[in-house]
Amino acid sequence: MRIIRPKKLKVGDLVTVVSPSQPVASRRNFKRGIRTLESLGLEVIPSKNVEAVFGMYEAGTAQQRAADLNEAFANDEVKAIFMSGGGFLANKVLPLLDYELIRKNPKIIIGFSDGATLLNAIFAKTGLITFHGFSVEHFFKRSTPYTVDSFLKIVEEGGVEFRPRTNWRILKGGRATGRLLGGNLLSFVNLLGTSYCPDLRRSILFFEEHDDYSEDVENSLTRLINAEILAGDYVQGIIFGKLVNIGLGSNDPDTKQWKKPKGFTMYQILKRRFEPYQIPILANVDFGLINTSLTIPIGIEAVMDTTKHQTRPFLKLTQPAVR
């Protein structure tokens, strides 16, 4: 597959906002997020159905959501597409997208949470580099200098390095080169076995998860392991971001009677699940449902180095994600 790098974003560019999953939860926060984008010198025009509601938890019908995305890619004046928020059911949109249109009209598309469903599927179907970062509705909360700097360095300047803000944690040492794929863990594993899942050969996976229980996270990890992609020419390394608001245990009330083992943590779970695999594992990286989050491109090649000689874990793109 030919890799397509979108054009750099520039001050004065016209951008749009779509809602591929759940409806806008807070109109006030949504408007504040738009103002944050405007403060960066961008002209923002929301899509036609961005504030639509269908049923109890969808931002319009799947047809409406797909139409907004297809129209955004078809509009030559639009230079980037942002997602309003996350949620679920972006997967209903996947069969309705015009991937040939997207391939012929490449542009920046950035999202978070369930948006990872679209980001990985679009890369898988077209080769277009996409971007995992933030949602507009939450951007005003996450518009810290670190978040904004990371976003601008990747999409405007063509930066290739990721600067740690906190202490990244090495769970397993090693060095790997591969194509960055991932985003939200559950959204990604839901793509496994479908035509919307990217080719996982020579890949480095990166995951965030939030507002869940460790049992559910481990279930998603097990689905990943059972796909038999953690050996040979497939996954070369795994990066975990911040695991936010993950309750230890299960959401099943019948399990509340069971005592938590001493020292039981998410890090312990990650170490245990990936112990048999000889690939580097990095955790606590600065991305996820936090107010200081990196923008990470999906589909571009990167190098991760967690060997002992490194004073700090190292992550770098082999080339810019934009042109």
Model-derived features: where do they sit?
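N-terminal glycine-rich "phosphate-gripper" loop used for MgATP/nucleotide binding
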Residues: A80-N91
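Conserved anion/nucleotide-ligand pocket segment
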Residues: G127-G193
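ATP/nucleoside-binding phosphotransfer catalytic cores, i.e., glycine-rich phosphate-binding loops
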Residues: K242-R323
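Conserved beta-alpha junction segments in alpha/beta enzyme cores
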Residues: V24, R28-N29, R175, R179-D212
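Short, acidic/small-residue loops that bind anionic groups at enzyme active sites
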Residues: L97-A121, I129-S135, P280
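Internal helical hairpin/lid segments
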Residues: D199-T265
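Short acidic/histidine-rich motifs immediately flanking catalytic phosphotransfer sites
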Residues: N75-K79, Y234-V235
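ATP/NTP phosphate-donor binding region
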Residues: M1-E77
